[in-house]
């Protein structure tokens, strides 16, 4: 009897832990583009984006300074992340429709750019990928959670932030960049 009781207690504990994991991974669908309740964000909406220099796959460089005067999107991702994969077509559509008018900077958080590039090729993505080296830029923005997408205005101020709650959608991004 004691063994059976212990078995059910262990199963219940496991189910409770799985439910908690699912709730933290999926988030909610609340429409918000502010990160005021995001305790993992270091740079929040209304704050200046930090200075940075990223290297493209073609050895080109992009810097925060070179983007002054433009609205741009900074996306941190991993190709193994399901929510990131959902967001890629949205960002690709923004890239296709706005091109250099609204640069989309895709930065792998914890995987090599080679793996990201392979995923891009397999899935027909053409937007650029940039290297952050040792995740320095990511950790200036946040402590964890991907996808993490920021929209930065022409003055270098973060005007919107999306993470996995909610992930970025085309209509929301377009509404923000058109303001």
Language-model segments: residues:
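Thiol/disulfide oxidoreductase modules built on the thioredoxin-like
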Residues: 119-125, 133-178
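N-terminal targeting signals for export/organelle localization
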Residues: 1-51, 171-174, 179
